[in-house]
A protein has these predicted regions:
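Residues immediately flanking
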Residues: 20, 83, 141
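Phosphate-binding site of ATP-dependent enzymes
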Residues: 8-9, 14-16, 132-135, 151-236
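Active-site nucleotide/adenylate-binding loops and adjacent lid/helix of ATP-dependent enzymes
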Residues: 89-184
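Glycine-rich phosphate/pyrophosphate-binding beta-alpha loops
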Residues: 21-29, 147, 201-208
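Active-site "cap" helix and flanking loop/linker of ATP-utilizing ligase/carboxylase catalytic domains
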Residues: 36-68, 202-242, 246, 285-288
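Conserved metal-phosphate-binding beta-hairpin within the catalytic cores
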Residues: 1-24, 224-303
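A short alpha/beta connector and helix-capping loop motif
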Residues: 14-16, 29-41
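A short, GP-enriched loop/loop-strand-helix hinge that lies immediately N-terminal to
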Residues: 24, 35, 39-60, 64-65, ...
Length: 303
């Protein structure tokens, strides 16, 4: 199953899995841009995805993607998640993979993940104990993207001073994933039991989604090749958007689907650590590919 898998990395080189994205998440296009800026030439990522799809699934990648049983429900579901459309008229249990609590339950035994609990606004004791024990946590939606409504909590009292939480949410252990003062995450892409590509996101915001795209190179020590780097801007329709939407992309997503900023620098990561990311990505992809979607626990949006 084609996946976009998000990791955090602490300054001490501890790796945490935080999220898995299904359908056609970003990743290949972003990697391609970082490859272009860093090496001055096009990557072969799209050809590799296509050849892997044909080798493993016997279909072109577009045909493979549209053969997924939940894909027709997932497209309107993503727009519903953004608050820009109705809940899909046709439901498929594969949508339950969008509930981050389900992801946590599914993967916490096989990958290091920040400790997470369901946030219950009526259970003040449980939330207080979690914040006291972890010192710093984040409150985030169980179903959502783009870091919408994400908040950093450092005191139990602040948890209950928040505006009423209208969406089912999680409390999650805060992981300090920063480099040179910038928030850092790594997006890895896997398909058909094979690792495809990875790149880094850098941001001045607490969450690094849709940040500055950065090429990843093996080496030592862990860090950026340039402390103060320039960036290059791109404004072109992504490969994913063309396949997913064709000519009918929603106007509100234009920034996400077209505009990217790429660092003229690389994130240097030791080779054994890169290997760990690749191995975990393949392991997670195999688990997802072999899931019986009809046996997934119900998601929060079904309750």
């Amino acid at each position: 199953m084609y996946l976009g898998i998000d990791f955090l990395i602490t300054p001490e080189l501890k790796l945490y899995l935080v999220e898995v994205n299904v359908g056609l998440p970003g990743g290949a296009h972003e990697y391609h841009l970082t490859h272009w800026v860093h090496l001055g030439k096009a990557s072969d990522i799209f050809q590799r995805i296509e050849s892997t799809s044909q080798k493993i699934y016997g279909k072109t990648f577009t045909d493979y993607l549209h053969s997924l049983p939940f894909i027709d429900s997932l497209k309107p579901f993503k727009i519903w998640m953004d608050g820009m459309g109705p809940f899909p008229g046709t439901f498929h249990p594969g949508l339950r993979l969008e509930d981050k609590w389900n992801q946590y339950q599914l993967l916490k035994a096989i990958a290091p993940m920040p400790e997470t609990m369901i946030f219950d606004p009526e259970d003040t004791g449980g939330g207080n104990r979690f914040v006291k024990r972890k010192k710093k946590v984040i409150l985030k939606r169980r179903v959502g993207r783009g870091g919408r409504d994400l908040q950093v909590i450092t005191e139990p009292s602040s948890l209950w001073k928040l505006n009423p939480v209208s969406n089912p949410s999680l409390l999650q252990e805060y992981v300090e994933s920063k480099i040179n003062g910038l928030s850092l995450s790594v997006r890895s892409v896997a398909l058909g039991g094979e690792f495809m590509c990875m790149y880094a996101n850098l941001s001045t915001r607490p969450n690094s989604n849709h940040g500055i795209l950065t090429f990843i190179s093996p080496g030592n020590p862990f860090g950026l090749s340039e402390k103060h780097f320039k960036t290059e801007l791109f404004n072109q329709k992504s490969w994913e958007a063309e396949i997913w939407f064709g000519k009918n992309e929603p106007e509100y997503l234009r920034h996400n689907l077209y505009e990217e900023e790429v660092a003229r620098a690389t994130l240097i990561i030791p080779e054994p650590f890169l290997r760990k990311i690749k191995e975990l990505s393949i392991k997670i992809e195999r688990i997802y590919d072999e899931l019986d979607l009809f046996r997934l626990p119900k998601a929060c949006f079904e309750e």
